[in-house]
Swiss-Prot record:
Entry binding sites for NAD(+): D19, K63, T105
Entry's localization field: Cytoplasm
Function: Catalyzes the oxidative phosphorylation of glyceraldehyde 3-phosphate (G3P) to 1,3-bisphosphoglycerate (BPG) using the cofactor NAD. The first reaction step involves the formation of a hemiacetal intermediate between G3P and a cysteine residue, and this hemiacetal intermediate is then oxidized to a thioester, with concomitant reduction of NAD to NADH. The reduced NADH is then exchanged with the second NAD, and the thioester is attacked by a nucleophilic inorganic phosphate to produce BPG.
Reaction equation(s) it catalyzes: D-glyceraldehyde 3-phosphate + phosphate + NAD(+) = (2R)-3-phospho-glyceroyl phosphate + NADH + H(+)
Top-level taxonomic group: Bacteria
The entry's keywords: Cytoplasm, Glycolysis, NAD, Nucleotide-binding, Oxidoreductase
Pathway listed: Carbohydrate degradation; glycolysis; pyruvate from D-glyceraldehyde 3-phosphate: step 1/5
Active site (record annotation): C135
Name the UniProt record assigns to this protein: Glyceraldehyde-3-phosphate dehydrogenase
CDD domains recorded: GAPDH_I_C, GAPDH_I_N
Encoding gene per record: gap
Gene Ontology terms: biological process: glucose metabolic process; glycolytic process
One GO cellular component term noted in the UniProt record for this chain: cytoplasm
Length: 294
C-alpha cells in the first residue's frame, strides 16, 4: 500500500525494496490486490530487479537492516514496515546502512517519537527516526485535537470497529497470547485490545490520561470506524461541534481530516486519502457536554 501510494506522488521515488519474498512474488502481489484491485501501471522483473512503470528498483532479502547498503542507491527515507524493528536501537541499523531517515509504520516500542499529521506534526524537529503511530491513532488524533482545542475534553472512551488484519485466523486456530484472536475472522465479531487511544496522549500530551479504548475486529476486508465518546469542558451543541470540525477539515487540516454529511458506509472509503473522515450524520449528543463522534 505504501508503494502504491508513492506512485501517485511526483516527489517520491522508490529506489529499493528489502523483503524476504522473491522478486517474482513481489511483482505478483503488487499487480493484484483483492481489496484495492489491479495495479494501475506496468510491473515486471528483470535481472532480479523489480521494474515498475519502466523504473528499475533494487530488490534485496536481508534479515539484518545493517547489511542493506542503502547508500549505494541514494536512499533518503526508509519506510520500516516489517513490524519488527520498532525501537531506536533496531531501526538505527538502517541509518548505519546509509539511510538518512527512518519512518516506522507502526507505534514505537520505546520512546522513539510518534508524529501524526493533523495532531503534532508541527513539532517535528528533524529527528532521524520517527514513528507514524497506528492507523487508529491517525484516525482518532486529528478529531480529538479539534474537539479539545475548541471545547476541551474532560475524559473519553474510544471504540474502533476494526477491519480484519493479516494476523487473524480464517478459521479457529491456536492463539496462545490472545484466545479470542484465534477465532475465525470471517465468523465473528471479536473484542480486542488497542493502545491507540492511549497513544493519542503521546502525540497530544494535553490529552494524556484522558482517553482509553478497545476494539472490535469485524469480518470486513478494509476500512475501520472510530467511535469517540467524550465529556466536554465547554458546553456545545452538536451543530457547533460539526461547524468546528468542518472548519478544520476545510482549513488547517485539509487533506488530513475530512468531513461528510453523505449517507456513507465503510466501502465508500476504500482508498480514502484522508487519514480521518468525520461522519457528521452518524454522531449523536446526549446533551451539550456528552457526545459520541464517528
Amino acid at each position: 500500500i505504501v508503494f502504491r501510494a508513492a506512485q501517485t506522488r511526483s516527489d517520491i521515488e522508490i529506489v529499493a525494496i528489502n523483503d524476504l519474498l522473491d522478486a517474482e512474488y513481489m511483482a505478483y502481489m503488487l499487480k493484484y490486490d483483492s481489496t484495492h484491485g489491479r495495479f494501475d501501471g506496468t510491473v515486471e522483473v528483470k535481472d532480479g530487479h523489480l521494474v515498475v512503470n519502466g523504473k528499475k528498483i533494487r530488490v534485496t532479502a536481508e534479515k539484518d537492516p545493517a547489511n542493506l547498503k542503502w547508500n549505494e542507491v541514494g536512499v533518503d527515507v526508509v519506510a520500516e514496515a516489517t513490524g519488527i524493528f520498532l525501537t531506536d536501537e533496531t531501526a538505527r541499523k538502517h541509518i548505519t546502512a546509509g539511510a538518512k531517515k527512518v519512518v516506522l509504520t507502526g507505534p514505537s516500542k520505546d520512546d522513539t517519537p510518534m508524529f501524526v499529521k493533523g495532531a503534532n506534526f508541527d513539532k517535528y524537529n528533524g529527528q532521524d527516526i520517527v514513528s507514524n503511530a497506528s492507523c487508529t491513532t491517525n484516525c482518532l488524533a486529528p478529531l480529538a485535537k479539534v474537539i479539545n482545542d475548541n471545547f476541551g475534553i474532560i475524559e473519553g472512551l474510544m471504540t474502533t470497529v476494526h477491519a480484519t488484519t493479516a494476523t487473524q485466523k480464517t478459521v479457529d486456530g491456536p492463539s496462545h497470547k490472545d484466545w479470542r484472536g484465534g477465532r475465525g475472522a470471517a465468523q465473528n465479531i471479536i473484542p480486542s485490545s488497542t493502545g491507540a487511544a492511549k497513544a493519542v496522549g503521546k502525540v497530544l500530551p494535553e490529552l494524556n490520561g484522558k482517553l482509553t479504548g478497545m476494539a472490535f475486529r469485524v469480518p470486513t476486508p478494509n476500512v475501520s470506524v472510530v467511535d469517540l465518546t467524550v465529556r466536554l469542558e465547554k458546553a456545545a451543541s452538536y451543530e457547533d461541534i460539526k461547524k468546528a470540525i468542518k472548519a478544520a477539515a476545510e482549513g488547517e487540516m485539509k487533506g488530513v481530516l475530512g468531513y461528510t454529511e453523505d449517507d456513507v458506509v465503510s466501502t465508500d472509503f476504500n482508498g480514502e486519502v484522508c487519514t480521518s473522515v468525520f461522519d457528521a450524520k452518524a454522531g449523536i449528543a446526549l446533551n451539550d457536554n456528552f457526545v459520541k463522534l464517528v
